[in-house]
């Protein structure tokens, strides 16, 4: 979530964009826990994305499966983007998205030693063009 937060904040600032300029802001994957953390971090900067945000990890599982931390970032981001969002963009149902592939280097040893978890978020804008 911290990397997605920084990337979204920087993107909006660098390109003079607003959240409202996007039909969806898509992450892959933060899961339920990470999405809530992202909302909290962005709200601290006066940025509200909850009504436009979709997370590939959250979409891949039903709420009954109780997978609070999502799926495999690279796997679910590619799967959900290509099977769910790209057809909607191609048809024009969705016009513009900010897509962030998120990832973290999860090391049980580092976590047990109290070290931080390195994370990254790459962003790309995908648009439907008539």
Please provide the spans of the model-predicted regions.
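Claisen-condensing/thiolase-fold acyl-transfer catalytic domains that form or cleave C-C bonds
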Residues: 23-130
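Phosphate/pyrophosphate-binding loops at sites that engage ATP/ADP/AMP, CoA/4′-phosphopantetheine
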Residues: 7-21, 88-89
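Loop-centered beta-sheet repeat module
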Residues: 1-2
């Amino acid at each position: 979530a911290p990397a997605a937060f920084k990337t979204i904040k920087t993107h909006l600032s660098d390109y003079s964009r607003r959240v409202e300029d996007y039909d969806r802001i898509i992450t892959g994957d933060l899961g339920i826990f990470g999405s809530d953390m992202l909302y909290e971090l962005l709200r601290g900067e006066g940025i509200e994305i909850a009504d436009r945000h979709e997370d590939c990890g959250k979409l891949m599982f039903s709420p009954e499966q109780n997978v609070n931390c999502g799926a495999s970032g690279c796997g679910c981001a590619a799967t959900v983007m290509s099977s769910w969002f790209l057809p909607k963009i191609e048809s024009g149902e969705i016009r513009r998205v900010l897509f962030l592939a998120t990832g973290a280097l999860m090391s049980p040893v580092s976590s047990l030693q109290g070290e931080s978890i390195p994370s990254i978020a790459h962003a790309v804008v995908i648009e439907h063009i008539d």
